Amino acid sequence: MLSFDTNLAVHAANRDSASHAQSRGFIESLAARRDVAICELMLVELYLKLRNERIFTRPLTAAQAVAVCTAYRSNQAWQLIDCAPVMDDVWGLAAKSGFAFRRIIDVRLARTLLHHGVTEFATANVRDFAKLGFERVWNPLTT
């Protein structure tokens, strides 16, 4: 099973992004596949980014951002993942010296996806996920 990172969904939604067409094309290529899972945590992060004026020159309204997230949630071919009993592990990693505070989102996302059987992960930030347990982590924007 495979999943994809928030950054690809953000590029796909952002027409001003140099990676817009490629990200959108990648996500559209997954639309009918039955081996794709998306996580509610990723969608929460997407909602936050869609409304962020530092990312979008014209951020989406609350209703527009929810509509984008709902479109992902409503794909009947994909498995929708909510949460998993991973937080003891996540907190243990987060307590270690040198743990970057924003990394907690990536670690929780990875652990949740792995718990639900995801083995492949597409992201524009391969380095951030390379050692989190997936069999394959790749950047579809460079392949």
Question: Where do the model's predicted regions map?
Answer:
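Alpha-helix/helix-capping structural signal
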Residues: 7-8, 41, 85, 108, ...
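Short, hinge-like loop/turn segments at secondary-structure boundaries
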Residues: 53-57, 99, 139-141
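Acidic, PIN/NYN-like endoribonuclease modules and their adjacent C-terminal/linker elements
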Residues: 1, 107-143
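Aromatic- and histidine-enriched alpha-helix N-cap/loop-to-helix transition segments
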Residues: 38-44, 104
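Hydrophobic helix-cap positions at the C-terminus of alpha-helices
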Residues: 29-30, 72, 93
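Short, well-structured N-terminal submotif of metal-dependent ribonuclease cores
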Residues: 1-38, 53-67, 131
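Active-site neighborhoods of divalent-metal-dependent phosphate/nucleic-acid chemistry enzymes
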Residues: 77-124
